[in-house]
């Protein structure tokens, strides 16, 4: 059967019976849709009757919200799918205006409409499919040539008949003051509320948080998106999506799921944000992790003469397949870890480089562990060129940079034996941009020439991959000598600790050294592959092996020699 880029899944089974069926339903849908799957909830709708079904309001109860969590949790097994549960027809008891008569536009108009509704004979019965297509197009903007499929998932022998759940689902949402509730208890609506987060690589746990906030809010939802100082403590912050990109994805998702709401997406620059100062806000949605932050917001409001916000705490989604060193919850941090070793952007085409040898430029801030990664790559078969060693060669008496450097900086930079005292030379140029440029204008072209000669040597030895290990790779403009730039990153605090331990410098001196270099973010912005030595050595080894295996695949699949 054809695979569609976008689809609409209409769920008609009563919620209590639907929860145990979710996994096979989502698996069936994931075989047909490969990008965006919208989900429309209409429990009890009959597509087999004589009358054309109409969309009707679904009251927002704790059962509905818990079901939304179950669905997004199940969708996490199909991460290629961008699942979006549409909330237009889900209403709180206190706000039940009529459903909009116009068709709702969607960012990715469905090419196929699917349903869990089943005919008695298990066939693709045309009248039912026609009802389904008419229903879908009456609610949402769909592609002109809309297809329809009745899903008949394999529920397994032990699953049917399905018994209603007598025990409420685990609570997804908890008000700050716990109250006894039943699954059928309506959720209270509010006019205006807020939610905040980083929202990097919008995932299913984010979608639960945002969906609950959208159900609670009836007029406006303020969404604080963490930026600047609030990002510094994040794991692998260099791999965070830019603020504008995160906001763009957020906005599309929010407008898709509840276009009747007004959304105010603003940068979150401190822990309180608008929730701490806006008197018109009534509630704040937090996660288990950020609940204490929500309490702090309320204390801040009270101190400033504002009423407390009603806090709604959302459970975290468990990651069903966490890898070593990853969190056991669905999180952006884990997704960023999974990016390590992957190709982030297309390689450079370098027809001017020697054919038959693929050249990697390896860089990273001081203390990043770049050289240890180079040795791991060497162990896998790469020919490694150490630019520091080339620098030593160029400075040595008789070396290509020796005489020009002495002429530029004088003989007082020499040891008694005539060799260049690099410590004295370093003190001359450190903090003096003019003097540093004089030195780099002499040395960098020489090192680049020596590196090219080393690449030629690698080709002569039959090496397929050559790695240029260079801290100044990008500052020196040597990216034009490589097909890919690989960067090793670690937090600056860890880099300082390593430099102090390795080189015997003070923390201030170590920080000064780092400030004189390109930042990890600047390096990553121009990189094709990112690695990190933050964890145990065997974790780094696995990263390098993954990156190496993917590199070999790229080389073998290349249409011609690089």
Swiss-Prot record:
Family: In the central section; belongs to the eukaryotic CoaD family.
Location of the DPCK domain: 359-562
Gene that encodes the chain: COASY
Record note on modification: The N-terminus is blocked.
Residues annotated for ATP binding in this entry: 364-371
Protein name: Bifunctional coenzyme A synthase
Record pathway: Cofactor biosynthesis; coenzyme A biosynthesis; CoA from (R)-pantothenate: step 4/5; Cofactor biosynthesis; coenzyme A biosynthesis; CoA from (R)-pantothenate: step 5/5
Top-level taxonomic group: Eukaryota
Record localization: Cytoplasm; Mitochondrion matrix
Protein keywords: ATP-binding, Coenzyme A biosynthesis, Cytoplasm, Kinase, Mitochondrion, Multifunctional enzyme, Nucleotide-binding, Nucleotidyltransferase, Phosphoprotein, Transferase
InterPro entries associated with the record: Cyt_trans-like (IPR004821), Depp_CoAkinase (IPR001977), P-loop_NTPase (IPR027417), Rossmann-like_a/b/a_fold (IPR014729)
Protein's organism: Sus scrofa
List of residues that carry Phosphoserine: 177, 182
């Amino acid at each position: 059967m054809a695979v569609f880029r976008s689809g609409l899944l209409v769920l008609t089974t009563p919620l209590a019976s639907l929860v145990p069926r979710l996994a096979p339903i989502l698996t069936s849908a994931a075989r047909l849709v490969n990008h965006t799957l919208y989900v429309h909830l209409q429990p009890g709708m009959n597509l087999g009757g004589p009358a054309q079904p109409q969309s009707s309001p679904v009251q927002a109860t704790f059962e509905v919200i818990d079901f939304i969590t179950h669905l997004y949790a199940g969708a996490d097994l199909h991460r290629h799918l961008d699942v979006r549960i549409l909330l237009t027809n889900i209403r709180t008891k206190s706000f039940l205006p009529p459903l909009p008569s116009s068709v709702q536009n969607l960012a990715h108009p469905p090419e196929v409409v699917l349903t869990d509704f089943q005919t008695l004979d298990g066939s693709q019965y045309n009248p039912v499919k026609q009802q389904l297509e008419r229903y879908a197009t009456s609610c949402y903007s769909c592609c002109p040539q809309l297809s329809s499929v009745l899903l008949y998932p394999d529920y397994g022998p032990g699953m049917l008949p399905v018994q209603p759940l007598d025990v409420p689902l685990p609570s997804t949402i908890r008000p700050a003051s716990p109250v006894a509730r039943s699954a059928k208890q309506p959720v209270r609506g509010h006019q205006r509320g807020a939610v905040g987060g980083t929202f990097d690589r919008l995932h299913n746990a984010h979608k639960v948080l945002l969906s609950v906030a959208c159900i609670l809010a009836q007029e406006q939802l303020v969404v604080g998106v963490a930026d600047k100082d609030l990002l510094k403590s994040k794991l692998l912050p260099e791999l965070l999506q830019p603020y504008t990109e995160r906001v763009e994805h957020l906005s599309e998702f929010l407008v898709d799921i509840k276009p009747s709401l007004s959304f105010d997406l603003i940068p979150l620059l401190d822990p309180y944000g608008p929730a701490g100062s806006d008197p018109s806000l009534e509630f704040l949605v937090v996660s288990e992790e950020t609940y204490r932050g929500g309490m702090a917001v309320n204390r801040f409001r009270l101190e400033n003469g504002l009423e407390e916000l009603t806090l709604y705490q959302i459970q975290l989604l468990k990651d069903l397949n966490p890898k070593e060193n990853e969190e056991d919850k669905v999180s952006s941090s884990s997704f960023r870890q999974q990016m390590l070793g992957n190709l982030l952007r297309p390689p450079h085409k370098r027809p001017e480089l020697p054919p038959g040898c693929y050249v990697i430029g390896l860089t990273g801030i001081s203390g990043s562990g770049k050289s240890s990664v180079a040795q791991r790559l060497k162990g896998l078969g790469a020919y490694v060129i150490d630019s520091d060693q080339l620098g030593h060669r160029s400075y040595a008496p008789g070396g290509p940079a020796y005489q020009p450097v002495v002429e530029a900086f004088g003989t007082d930079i020499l040891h008694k034996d005539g060799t260049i005292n690099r410590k004295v030379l370093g003190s001359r140029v450190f903090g003096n941009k003019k003097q540093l440029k004089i030195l780099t204008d002499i040395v960098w072209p020489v090192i680049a020439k020596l590196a090219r000669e080393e690449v030629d040597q690698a080709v002569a030895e039959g090496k397929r991959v050559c790695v240029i290990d260079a801290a100044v790779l990008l500052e020196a403009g040597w990216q034009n000598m490589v097909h890919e730039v690989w960067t090793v990153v670690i937090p600056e605090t860890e880099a300082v600790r390593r430099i102090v331990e390795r080189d015997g410098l003070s923390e201030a001196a170590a920080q000064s050294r780092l400030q004189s270099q390109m930042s990890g973010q600047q390096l990553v912005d121009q990189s094709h592959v990112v690695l990190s030595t933050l964890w145990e050595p065997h974790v780094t080894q696995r990263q390098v092996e993954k990156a190496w295996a993917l590199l070999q695949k790229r080389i073998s699949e290349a249409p011609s020699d690089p």
